[in-house]
């Protein structure tokens, strides 16, 4: 019974990877739109996009960590 609950919890924790993928797509979609509207701010926009990518990717890295914690620690 407990092993099944652990597997369900680990699976639910990895759903965050899909959300992170959507978030990264939104970050770079916004970058393309902003550069198309104002090309003179391309370098500044790219810096902000990389920051947004890094923060979004951090969530994607926390998801498998939580899944492994659920499976092997608790």
Curated annotation (Swiss-Prot):
InterPro entries: ATP_synth_F0_csu, ATP_synth_F0_csu_DDCD_BS, ATP_synth_F0_csu_sf, ATPase_proteolipid_c-like_dom, F/V-ATP_Csub_sf. It is a multi-pass membrane protein. CDD domains: ATP-synt_Fo_c_ATP5G3. It is found in: Mitochondrion membrane. The chain crosses the membrane at residues 8-28, 50-70. Keywords: ATP-binding, CF(0), Hydrogen ion transport, Ion transport, Lipid-binding, Membrane, Mitochondrion, Nucleotide-binding, Transmembrane, Transmembrane helix, Transport. It holds the Pfam family ATP-synt_C. GO terms for cellular component: mitochondrial membrane; proton-transporting ATP synthase complex; proton-transporting two-sector ATPase complex, proton-transporting domain. The record marks 57 as: Reversibly protonated during proton transport. GO terms for biological process: proton motive force-driven ATP synthesis. One of its GO terms (molecular function) is lipid binding. This protein is one of the chains of the nonenzymatic membrane component (F0) of mitochondrial ATPase. HAMAP family: ATP_synth_c_bact. Belongs to the ATPase C chain family. F-type ATPases have 2 components, CF(1) - the catalytic core - and CF(0) - the membrane proton channel. CF(1) has five subunits: alpha(3), beta(3), gamma(1), delta(1), epsilon(1). CF(0) has three main subunits: a, b and c. This is ATP synthase subunit 9, mitochondrial.
């Amino acid at each position: 019974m407990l092993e099944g609950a652990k597997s369900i919890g680990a699976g639910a924790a990895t759903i965050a990877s899909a959300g992170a993928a959507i978030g990264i797509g939104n970050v770079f979609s916004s970058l393309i739109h902003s550069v198309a509207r104002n090309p003179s701010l391309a370098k500044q926009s790219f810096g902000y996009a990389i920051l947004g990518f890094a923060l979004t990717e951090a969530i994607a890295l926390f998801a498998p960590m939580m899944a492994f914690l659920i499976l092997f620690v608790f």
